[in-house]
């Protein structure tokens, strides 16, 4: 029996305990985890520093190091987000739909856990806690497979959480970590159909495409974020500058940050110098089309086809001047990843057209794409941003970690 199969067996054995746990017991487990994270802050930071030191030695970019880093403020924020989960309604057992048929049958559509969830993700250790606690609240067992970049942080966080859930009478194996960081273990996890009910990848295009291509377990695809802001000819320029700045520089290494800026030709000469002066403060590299280079000069690197389709996750942005809202929509359709897209405009007609015709999980008018987030949408923490159309789309909160069961009650009806 392999190591991965052993994890699957343990998760399946623990599944019933969490699936049938009361709301009070689940909330007590979450509170115990929240407290344990605060109590172990110094040790968590110490283990995280080992990962950060390795990241520096390996030449990891500053933006990606920021994704990896845990400090006292971030640990406290994660702890508080867990407490937010305890305040949220327990979706398990809730009724989506109910009816009484003409023959007297009472039919209800009820929410139940998915079962055992596998999650494969990269270098963000906060995902370890977010994913585990969301799965717990939704009544699921979880097997986590983090990236090797965050190995020490993840082992520490998992051990803290496993000890915490045991204090409230739940089995530690409702939360497990694959401590083998090899590609072989990832491939085996993708094929663990006997024990996993669903697999959720979180990370870059390479990881997600590999999971989609190789998994035999059902997959919920979460998003590569090649996101756009389109500045329409009627846009409020100051608003457009502020939205672009926030969407690109506030945290460039996350999937809801923009990678492309599209600007209507009639506003480009006024807008582009203003947005460049703001982006320059963050040392953002601009890769622009020929028209962009004509307006902004030699400081702009000429963009090629690849740039418009790249999720940089860094202080780099591709810029294109377009002739119309139709061209902007076509560009998004060609290069976008169905994640988050934005139009800045005063035109109600263009706003409605953009929201109607752009195919994405979240389509914004006059607001930053950085809001595509479970907390910001009022769902609590999220497991990821789904960019597919089956089962779930957009930020995946508690409800998206459940499925349905039909409950039918009769008094002897036969067909």
Can you say where each PLM-predicted feature lies in the sequence?
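ALDH superfamily catalytic-core signature
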Residues: 2, 123-126, 130-137, 167, ...
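Rossmann-like NAD(P) dinucleotide-binding subdomain of oxidoreductase/dehydrogenase enzymes
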Residues: 87, 96-238
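N-terminal Rossmann-like NAD(P)+-binding subdomain of aldehyde/semialdehyde dehydrogenases
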Residues: 1-107
